[in-house]
Curated annotation (Swiss-Prot):
The keyword DNA-binding applies. It comes from the Eukaryota. Disulfide bonds: none annotated. The nucleosome is a histone octamer containing two molecules each of H2A, H2B, H3 and H4 assembled in one H3-H4 heterotetramer and two H2A-H2B heterodimers. The octamer wraps approximately 147 bp of DNA. Variant histone H2A which replaces conventional H2A in a subset of nucleosomes. Nucleosomes wrap and compact DNA into chromatin, limiting DNA accessibility to the cellular machineries which require DNA as a template. Histones thereby play a central role in transcription regulation, DNA repair, DNA replication and chromosomal stability. DNA accessibility is regulated via a complex set of post-translational modifications of histones, also called histone code, and nucleosome remodeling. The keyword DNA-binding applies. This is Histone H2A.Y. Residues 256-279 are annotated as: Disordered. InterPro entries: Histone-fold, Histone_H2A, Histone_H2A/H2B/H3, Leu-rich_rpt, LRR_dom_sf.
Length: 388
């Protein structure tokens, strides 16, 4: 054996060892060997692959394989991909040991005759076969002959028996071959493809019979909501007052407009300044329409780039939206209260943008947080304030 061939075999063995990692031999399910031109199976490669007793998917592409005499015997294989090699029809007999194959990819090889396919034996579980770019596809009545040769065959060269493209279905079949314990080694190995076919048949049968029950793969537990006692009306009113008080206090801490009194706008118990302090509250604060953003607004004022471009970007965007909503609702609430209305309508929102200098600047494209800016084409129209 030449030195170059010895190097290639070593590369193949190293590739297999790298894919195995720390897994045991019976925990290896997928092996891929790509573009390593080892031409035929050396005894070391054969013995290494045969140690994987749970191997289900074997891919050997573009390796110039022309001799399958020493092909590894792995009965657990359900998908074999030998695309872009130099395999001839007389070599197919050495694949007989893989009798549980369900997907066989032999595209871009040198298979010439339909008779050569008979060398594969009776693969009764074969669902998908790919022979594209082989001379055999030019045979008269090629598709019918191949479908008759393999009774269980569903997809030939990505087409079904009716010539309808089933490429997506072929991909789904390939994906279903991945064992369910590939990442959780504590689960037992199951034949995923058989379970998929079983579930599909059950669903198909139930389309015509309303009395049958479709087998459920997973039963979702019913969530029973916990019983919550209904609070009294007095406690609800007290909680509401506490929430309003907390909001007003937070507004003072983040620099929003708030009453001048030290107790956050709550009327003082001192008789002399009671009405004076209460009258200094804005109409929105009196009605509970104050929405301080707390931490989110501080994010905006800090102008830190990491909040805008890193993993906290979603928090930053939520802060922008919540901040805008708070500003608009507060200003629109003031306008509604001034007009002696209990609800905010679109006119009040439009006036809120017109009368609030900060919102007006934002809508006009004011730069915020070192680079974030808004489009001037905002949903709400901007009306210039008329001079009196």
């Amino acid at each position: 054996m030449s030195t170059d061939q010895e190097k290639i075999i070593k590369q193949v063995l190293d590739s297999i060892a790298e894919q195995q990692g720390d897994s045991r031999d019976d925990e290896v399910y997928v092996i891929e060997i790509m573009s390593l031109r080892f031409e035929k199976f050396d005894n070391r490669i054969k013995q290494k692959i045969e140690r994987f007793t749970s191997l289900q998917m074997l891919t050997i592409n573009d390796c110039l394989i022309s001799d399958l005499t020493n092909f590894p015997h792995v009965p657990s294989l359900i998908r074999l991909d030998l695309v872009f090699n130099k395999i001839t029809g007389d070599q197919l007999q050495y694949l007989r040991g893989s009798r549980h194959l369900q997907t066989l990819m032999l595209g871009a090889n040198q298979i010439e005759e339909i008779e050569d396919l008979k060398r594969l034996g009776q693969m009764r579980e074969l669902i998908q076969l790919d022979l594209l770019n082989n001379p055999v596809v030019n045979t008269n009545n090629y598709r019918n002959l191949v479908f008759n040769l393999f009774p269980s065959l569903v997809i030939l060269d990505t087409l079904d028996k009716n010539g309808i493209d089933q490429e997506k279905a072929a991909l789904d079949i390939s994906a279903s071959r991945v064992p369910d314990n590939l990442f959780d080694k504590s689960k037992p190995v199951q034949n995923v493809s058989k379970q998929v076919v079983k579930n599909a048949k059950a669903t198909q049968n139930n389309l015509f019979s309303s009395t049958q029950k479709v087998a459920q793969v997973k039963q979702i537990p019913k969530i029973v909501p916990a019983k919550v006692s209904k609070p009294s009306q007095a406690s609800v009113q007290d909680n509401k007052s506490n929430v309003v008080q907390a909001k007003v206090t937070a507004a003072v801490s983040v620099g929003r407009k708030a009453p001048a009194s030290r107790n956050g706008g709550v009327p003082s118990k001192a008789g002399k300044g009671k009405m004076n302090a209460f009258s200094k509250q804005s109409t929105s604060q009196k009605s509970g329409l104050v929405f301080p953003c707390g931490r989110l607004r501080r994010y905006l004022k800090q102008a830190c780039k990491q909040f805008r471009v890193s993993s906290s970007c979603n928090i930053y965007l939520a802060g922008v939206l919540e901040y805008l909503a708070a500003e608009v609702l507060e200003t629109a609430g003031n306008i509604a209260k001034n007009n002696r209305l209990s609800r905010i309508n679109p006119v009040h929102i439009r006036e809120a943008f017109r009368n609030d200098a900060e919102l007006n600047q934002f809508v006009n494209g004011t730069i915020i947080a070192e680079g974030g800016s808004t489009s001037t084409n905002f949903v709400l129209p901007i009306i210039n304030k008329s001079k009196k």
